[in-house]
């Protein structure tokens, strides 16, 4: 299931039947937008949540990621700050996919790239020109032996192609497993740039 909450009253607004294990949910930050999106790990679907003409929230199955029969396992998703596109990572095949979300009820896949043997988290910069990836999902589920990629990779995005900027091999550096990232360049309450005295940074947490 997917549950939409009213954070002011701390009560659920609506409970949706979302088969296939929805993992991450994201809201569009584009001014004027009022929709959210999730993906399902086991069925490789994209679901969008929007209000209908009566103000009732509805769930829409709007897309399929990869070949569901092979269980690519969609894990992390990240909407770009303009709300026009979304990165989707699939863990089992190590792929990242860019979807055009300018019409959220009719999204289209526009780009794919293999990041490694496995890939988990994705975090685009607020200007959309850089994209960061880490690889570990859960230690017991990560690939084994030579396929056990544990890295942070940073790419530059020119609108057409991801080009590797740098990478950190967590196994080589004895840093553990590269799981979660937090990229911060703006105040998340106002979406305004942080003060010049505070530099933008990437925090990486290993699990």
Identify the role of each PLM range.
Residues 1-207:
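Predominantly soluble domains enriched in secretory-pathway, periplasmic, or organellar proteins
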């Amino acid at each position: 299931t997917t549950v939409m909450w009213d954070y002011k009253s701390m009560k659920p607004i609506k409970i949706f039947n979302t088969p296939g294990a929805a993992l991450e949910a994201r809201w569009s930050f584009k001014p004027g937008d009022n929709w959210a999106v999730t993906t399902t790990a086991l069925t490789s679907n994209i679901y969008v949540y929007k209000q209908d003409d009566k103000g009732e929230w509805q769930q829409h199955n709007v897309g399929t990621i990869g070949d569901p029969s092979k269980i690519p396992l969609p894990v992390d998703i990240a909407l770009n700050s303009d709300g026009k596109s979304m990165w989707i990572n699939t863990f089992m095949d190590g792929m990242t996919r860019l979807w055009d979300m300018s019409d959220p009820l009719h999204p289209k896949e526009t780009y794919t790239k293999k990041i490694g043997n496995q890939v988990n988290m994705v975090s685009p910069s607020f200007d959309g020109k850089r994209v960061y990836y880490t690889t570990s999902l859960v230690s017991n589920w990560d690939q084994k032996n030579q396929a056990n990629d544990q890295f942070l990779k940073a790419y530059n995005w020119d609108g057409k192609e991801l080009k590797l900027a740098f990478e950190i091999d967590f196994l080589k550096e004895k840093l553990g497993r590269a799981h979660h990232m937090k990229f911060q360049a703006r105040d998340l309450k106002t979406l305004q740039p942080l003060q010049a005295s505070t530099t933008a940074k990437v925090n990486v947490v290993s699990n």
